[in-house]
Design a protein with these regions (language model features):
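Nucleotide-activated sugar donor-binding and catalytic core shared by glycosyltransferases
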Residues: 1-209, 214-283
Length: 283
């Protein structure tokens, strides 16, 4: 069966979840994404073909929706996996003619539901199955019921955060506090200050290190190691403590190692990291 995976969102989280989903189901689907790190070749997902909209395709909603429909018609999948946003990131999948006769499956993670529903105009795809891949809030659980598809809880596989493995390329020093984030420089600096202040409050003198995509942040002191690496699993397994935002993937990966995970939720347009953090603390 020809399968396509639809993950528009731009951030690394969608591609990381794509990798985890394909690992679990042993899939190598077609991929529709707008991730810039995939476009640049810095990340090479195990997918064929990989289809990315260009600048002209993304100039406005109608152009983007036209590209999406054409891309799906070129792939002609029998099944479409829709990541995170059931109507697409802008609502482009609502009433999309190209989805007729295609089995649509939705991967449901936490949404800022009030913000997301403002983007929807029309009818969502007719899903045949919904995978609920994390604990959701009550409002979103009720919304899933309106989609009239069977809901199955699914825990995607992530590398252990407590494997104590050593990387072939990098070995972190003892008592290393690692900051991992794929967001912008302002958010990275917030996490750096969070880690530094935690050490001061506790009277600790750890060795710090940071993982982020791209060049070394200007604010980072010269004696702090910086790694532009994806994925960072081997470093996460070595660190004594991890400092991050509350994105879906890192929270899933650290679920069984929450004692070493320090979380600073960040505002997002369509995600609710604060809700995710609250639900995690209730477990």
């Amino acid at each position: 069966m020809t399968t396509a995976y639809y993950c528009m969102g731009g951030g690394l989280g969608h591609i990381t979840r794509f990798t985890a989903f394909c690992r679990y189901f042993t899939l190598r689907p077609a991929l529709l994404t707008n991730c810039e790190l995939v476009r640049s070749g810095m990340i090479e997902p195990d997918a064929r073909p990989i289809m990315l909209p260009d600048e002209a395709d993304s100039i406005d909603f109608d152009s983007f929706r036209t590209w999406v429909g054409s891309a799906i018609e070129r792939i002609r999948p029998e099944a479409l996996i829709v990541d995170a946003f059931p109507g697409g990131i802008l609502g482009e999948l609502c009433d999309l003619p190209a989805l007729k006769h295609i089995e649509c499956i939705y991967l449901a993670r936490i949404l800022d539901l009030q913000a997301y529903r403002l983007r929807l105009s029309g009818t969502l795809p007719e899903f045949t199955k919904i995978y609920r891949i994390e604990q959701l809030g009550n409002e979103q659980n009720q919304w899933l019921k309106t989609m009239r598809a069977p809901v199955e809880d699914l825990m995607l596989p992530y590398p252990s955060a407590s494997a104590h493995g050593k990387s072939e390329n990098t070995e972190l020093p003892d008592n290393c506090w690692l900051i991992v984030h794929s967001g912008n420089a302002d958010e990275l600096e917030q996490l750096w200050q969070f880690a530094r202040q935690t050490a001061e409050i506790e009277g600790q003198t750890p060795t710090f290190a940071m993982v982020s995509q791209g060049s070394r942040p200007e604010f980072l002191p010269a004696n702090i190691a910086h790694y532009s690496r994806y994925p960072a699993d081997e470093l996460i397994a070595q660190c004594t403590r991890l400092f991050s935002a509350a994105g879906f993937n890192i929270m899933q990966q650290m679920k069984d190692s929450s004692n070493k995970h320090h979380v600073l939720p960040m505002p997002r347009a369509l995600d609710d990291q604060f809700l995710r953090c609250r639900l995690a603390n209730q477990r």
